[in-house]
A protein has these predicted regions:
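Detector for methionine-enriched segments
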Residues: 1, 83, 102, 140, ...
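Terminal catalytic/cofactor-binding subdomain
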Residues: 2-143, 235
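Short strand->helix junction
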Residues: 76-79, 150, 154
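Loop-rich catalytic cores of soluble enzymes, especially ATP-dependent carboxylate-amine ligases
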Residues: 122, 152-236
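An acidic/histidine-cluster motif and surrounding catalytic segment
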Residues: 147
Length: 236
């Protein structure tokens, strides 16, 4: 059953999303790190100072919370190239962090830190996120690794997504690293997944058969004021 009625060509035209296809398979990686105090192991809201010391670097980004530094790769041809790209940035960044009495921490959540003690990064997009998501948004004390894959044609996107969703439980089991929350054992191997899905535009993607269905979904989300931009959809 199609989610985009074929009888609405005008709506289809308005919903169209330009697809930036990749002439060959590529990948890029975004890796979120928490900053933790070397002595207490609690989170440290020092990302602004760390990024300032690193200087202008397109491979280092701020994130929603000021306890987080994101390291990103460029567009790479293979996994080995992406890993080396990340290492080249991570080495100097780690040294700066250690010189400031902190360590880089990588897990889905922090085992005991309190979300209410964390500071938000001052940026319009993050302010809008909190405005829309309120209490749940302020609790997003989570980190992850995002892999972007270049695909030649929009027609290939949904079949690939469907195939990946069939293996979602396996991928989650392999990457789960967040059983603790606020000092308590949650009983879940990935409490990060449980927290993230509370946001209305996060969690698992819907099942679309065609790219046009996804375009229609994004159009409706914008039309109803749920999102302003497509990148506000943050599916796992």
């Amino acid at each position: 059953m199609s989610l985009v009625p074929a009888s609405l060509p005008a709506r289809r035209s308005a919903a169209r999303i330009d697809f930036a296809g990749s002439p060959r398979p590529t990948l890029g990686v975004e890796w979120e790190f928490a900053l933790v105090d070397s002595q207490t192991r609690d989170l440290s809201n020092e990302a602004t100072a760390v990024i300032a010391e690193i200087g202008e670097n397109p491979r280092v980004h701020k994130e929603l919370l000021r306890n987080t530094v994101e390291i990103v790769s460029g567009i790479c041809e293979c996994t080995a190239e992406a890993m080396q790209d990340l290492r080249d940035t991570l080495g100097p960044a780690r040294q700066i962090v250690r010189d400031r009495g902190m360590e880089l921490f990588c897990a889905g959540t922090h085992p005991f830190a309190r979300w209410s003690a964390q500071k938000l990064t001052d940026a319009p997009r993050y302010a809008e996120l909190i405005k829309r998501t309120q209490w749940w948004g302020r609790q997003m004390l989570i980190w992850g690794v995002h892999v972007h894959v270049g695909i030649r044609s929009a027609h290939k996107v949904m079949p690939i997504m469907t195939s990946l969703l069939n293996y979602y439980p396996h991928l989650l089991a392999l990457s789960a690293s967040s059983p603790w929350w606020g000092g308590e054992d949650t009983g879940y191997a990935s409490n990060r997944a449980m927290m993230f899905q509370q946001l209305p535009t996060a969690g698992l993607p819907f099942h679309f058969q065609r790219w046009a269905e996804f375009e229609g979904f994004v159009y409706d989300q914008k039309k109803t004021g749920i999102i302003d931009h497509m990148d506000e959809i943050r599916w796992d």
